[in-house]
């Protein structure tokens, strides 16, 4: 069922409409003139929703979408343009001026840091820089085996497709890390296992973000519970769910670009 046809979608539309009315007054009366734009660059099923929720505990930051997986591309005015329009295809060009105008209506412009999380933006950094000033890119990667498990389980994809897609994402992240100047690369593993160190890196990267809370429970989607839970590394359990026959096929694909895994500190799992 398409979200456009669901009861929940209409509830979301009501929320978005109310939010924009509220933002219209606060932004026009009290909004700042200058902002820092923070873009989370993270492939799907790599912890981006958790990272978004963690950063959103800052009182000096505004996220453009607080519903669901919290992606800016899912806001109603841009959903058909971004989410349903072959977002992972290179030949698709987005009307970024229009997208920015829409996002500005959802951001709380009283905040200094305005944040977006849209997974496909890992392949559109140069386009973003042409439209947004004062940009900061927070890039995060995750063990590709854990990502593959998520793609297979959540999307119903086979092991071959999932493995090739995971490598595609790592290629974009490698390029972003080497080309973009104002970027910070962290890993899902460090975010979960060395949380305070990761948060310190983020605060040093963009000091305006201010205080961030981590010792609370978050509702980011995971396969263990539909409720909230504290920050926890779920990689081991996810990877153990991969069938042996699928692991063999995944390894046959990963071994061809072993250097790419090693670039981010990952290894082939036998």
PLM features: residue spans?
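Short, well-ordered beta-strand elements within core beta-sheets of diverse protein domains
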Residues: 39-41, 189-191, 243
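Generic structural signal for well-ordered alpha-helical scaffold segments
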Residues: 103-104, 174
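PAPS-dependent sulfotransferase catalytic domain
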Residues: 76, 80, 109-212, 231
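A structural signal for well-ordered alpha-helical scaffolds and beta->alpha junctions
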Residues: 37, 48, 92, 96, ...
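A short, structured active-site edge motif that brings together acidic residues
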Residues: 66-73, 140-145, 215-217
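Glycine-rich helix-loop-beta junction characteristic of Rossmann-like nucleotide cofactor-binding loops
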Residues: 31, 104-108
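PAPS-dependent sulfotransferases, especially Golgi type II membrane carbohydrate sulfotransferases
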Residues: 1-37, 206-270
């Amino acid at each position: 069922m398409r979200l456009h046809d669901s009861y929940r979608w209409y509830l979301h539309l009501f929320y978005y409409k109310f939010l924009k009315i509220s933002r219209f007054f606060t932004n026009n009366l009290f909004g700042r003139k200058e902002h820092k734009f923070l873009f989370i660059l993270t492939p799907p099923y790599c912890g981006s929703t958790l990272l978004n929720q963690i950063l959103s505990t800052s009182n000096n930051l505004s996220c453009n979408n607080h519903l669901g997986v919290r992606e800016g591309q899912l806001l109603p005015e841009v959903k058909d343009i971004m989410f349903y329009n072959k977002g992972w295809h290179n030949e698709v060009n987005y009307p970024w001026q229009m997208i920015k105008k829409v996002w500005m209506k959802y951001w709380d412009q009283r905040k200094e840091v305005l944040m977006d999380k849209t997974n496909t933006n890992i392949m559109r950094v140069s386009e973003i820089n042409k439209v947004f000033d004062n940009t900061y890119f927070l890039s995060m990667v995750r063990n590709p085996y854990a990502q593959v498990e998520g793609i297979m389980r959540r999307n119903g994809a086979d092991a071959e497709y999932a493995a090739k897609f995971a490598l595609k994402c790592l290629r974009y992240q490698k390029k972003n890390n080497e080309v973009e100047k104002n970027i910070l690369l962290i890993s899902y593993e460090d975010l979960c296992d060395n949380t305070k160190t990761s948060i310190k890196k983020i605060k040093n990267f963009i000091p305006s973000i201010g205080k961030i809370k981590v010792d609370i429970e978050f509702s980011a989607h995971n396969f263990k519970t539909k409720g909230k839970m504290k920050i926890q590394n779920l990689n081991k359990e996810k990877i153990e769910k991969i069938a042996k026959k699928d692991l063999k096929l995944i390894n046959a694909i990963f071994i061809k670009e072993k250097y790419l895994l090693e670039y981010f500190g990952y290894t082939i799992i036998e």
